[in-house]
Each structure stands twice: as structure tokens, then as C-alpha cells.
Amino acid sequence: MPSPAPSHPWLALSATLAVQVLVTMALVSASVLAPAVAPTLGVAPERIGLYAGVGYLLAMVSGLRSGHGVAAVGALRLTQWALLSCAAGTVLAGLGPVATLLPAAALIGVGYGLVNPATAAVLNHHVPTTARGLFFSTKQTGVPIGVALAGLLMPLGLVTIGWRATAVALGVACVLTALAVQPSVKRLEPPRMPPPPDGALRLLVTVWRHPGLRAMSLASLAFATTQQVFVTFLVALLNLGLGWSLAASAGLLAVSQVASAVARIAFGVVGDHWLAPWRVLVGLGLTMALSCVALGAVALGWREAPLAVVAAVALACAATAMGWNGVFFAALAQRVPREDLPRISGATQFFTFGGGMAGPLLFGESVRAGAGWGWGFVAVALVPLLAAWNLARASRSR
């Protein structure tokens, strides 16, 4: 199918970026608040891995159905429904008893899983092919921006209005963002495509049988594992492992996200103009492995490490472990037809969120079992290292 001329690239970017910021805040806010809130609820802080795991499990499932959702209601309209699902989850978490936290995580996960395939369809329709890396990477800066805002605003809300009111306020913000997108629906909505012909299982089989898509899917699983372990446990590592205050720990998380946002855009430009996105992904896998080893070394042997050293290591982890998403979607858009992008991105996202689900859960349980923060991060480094090797091998065999 020929590519239509781009029409509203910057409006499309603004709308999809706003959506990405809010759903990310909804997903990670619990991780920021866990060290302070979990003990008051009678829950160990490392059990936040279970909450994150439930969210990502539901994101995996909803992402597989995103192609049907785009066909049924439209891509941009689906992002509005995703925001409302996240709003319902945050409000439920804020108003309900402890038993409702996992259902709240499920609602947030459903919304989060719909966003990437839907926003990819919107951007792919409006963005010139020569600038995919820049636009997709800029949209994906919504993830570190969302994490940074959560790191800044959640502790502030905790001490001013309490964590429950803060969660409800975040839900209200999601609803307001869904309403703000409404005036742009007619201008941004891509033409409707027929519903995907294959079911979820067949779609996964299709992706798995394609060598390039299989390598990319496994890389996304590995990179998401690393990313979510970093985002979920950095505050706890600094607060509980290195003795930092919660405010200082969350503040470093926020600053690291600013660095990762800049890195995402830079990697996207590199993928557009100098290196193939595939090669950029290989390099990111290698560097995120080195960064995780450095973070683990700090946690293992240097409790009194200077602030500058800890900050530099955290920035390196954030830039690499959180800098891959935009380049990944740009590479995916190069490999699949425009009309197949929502369903194929939903299928590869199944692996991405599988890493997001398993990583925090396994890491949290390993810490509880006595592995400690340092050795946990050293072990995580093996995951992106193997993914980089597999991507390079698949690239040579094409």
C-alpha cells in the first residue's frame, strides 16, 4: 500500500506524547511510593514486583488485541479508552482496600498495553518515513518523562495530600488528557483498516517464524526486563540499599529520566541518518549490560559512594536501558507494511511486556531470597548482553 503524504506530524506527536506520559505515570507511580507506603499497608516494599508483574501481564494480553481495537474504534480513539482504563485503575488503588491493588494494577495494565500499537498507527500515518526514528523516539520520551514526573510529584503528593488522594488526582489527570485529545480525533485518526484476520495465537506464531521479527521480539523482552528492573527498583536500591532519603532517591530517578529522554531522541536521529536502527539496538544492548554491572558494583561495595558517582551510573543505566524503544518501533515500521503495524507491534509488545512482567517479579523475589541489590543488577546485565548477541547474529544471517 503506498504511503499517504504526511499531514499533521507535529499534532500527532503532541497528542501521542501526552498519552504516553500519563499512562506511564499511572504504571510507575506505585514503584515510587512503595518504600514509604508498603510498610503502612503491611506489605514488604519488594512486593511491588508482583504489582508491576500483574500490570504487565494484562498489558501483554491487551496489546495482542490492539489490532482489533484499532479496527473497531480507531487508533486515536483507542488511546482515549486506554487513558480511561488507567484512570479507573489509579482511582481504585486510591480509594479501595489493599485487596483492590492487584485489580487496580490489572486495569492500568490493560490501558498501558493498548497505547503503543495505537500510537504507532497514528504516527506511522502522519510522519515522513525519513524521520521515523526522530518522531517515534520523541514520542517514546513520554516514558522517561512520565517516570520523572512520577518521581517528582508522587513524593510531593505523599507529604501534602496523602498517597490515596495523590492516586485519585492522577486518575483525574488521565481523564482530562483523554478529553484534551478529543478535538484532534477527526484530523489525526488514520483510515480504518479491516479487522486482523488472525487470532492472538496465530499472530504470535507468525512473528516467531519470521527470523528478523523473532530476534527483535526477544531483544524487546530482554531490554524491557532491564528497563523495568531499573525503573521499579532504583528508588528502593538507593533508599534501602544505600541509605538515601526517599526524596533524594526519587529525585535521582527523575533526573535520570531527563537524561534518558534526551538519549532516546539522540538514538532516533542516529538511526535515521548514520546507523541502521538494527545496529543501534545492538549497541544499546551492549552498553546497558555494562551500565547494569556498574550499578551492581556500586550497590555491592561502595555504600558511601560519592553522589557524583552514583548519579553518573544511574544516568548511564537510564540512557541505555530506557533509550531503545523509539529506535525499536522505527526499525519495526521499516520491516512491516503500514496496515500491519498495529497488530505486529502488538505481537512484539507481547514479548516486551513479558520482560516487563517477569523482570521486576523475579528480581524482587531474588532480593527477598537474599541475593541482594548488587548481585541482582549484575545478573540482570546478562539479559541485554545475550539479546545484543542474538540481534547481531540475526543481522549477519539475513
Task: Give residue spans per PLM region.
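Helix-loop-helix hairpin linking two adjacent transmembrane segments in secondary transporters
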Residues: 139-186
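C-terminal transmembrane helical hairpin of 12-TM major facilitator-type secondary transporters
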Residues: 277-328
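Juxtamembrane intracellular "pre-TM" segments in multi-pass secondary transporters
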Residues: 2-6, 188-217
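Cytoplasmic helix-loop-helix junction between adjacent transmembrane helices
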Residues: 105-143
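Cytoplasmic membrane-interface "Motif A"-like loop-to-helix N-cap segments
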Residues: 72-82, 273-287
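Extracytoplasmic gate region of multi-pass secondary transporters
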Residues: 30-31, 212-257
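A late C-terminal transmembrane helix in Major Facilitator Superfamily
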Residues: 335-370
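Conserved MFS/SLC helix-loop-helix module at the cytosolic interface between two early adjacent transmembrane helices
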Residues: 61-98
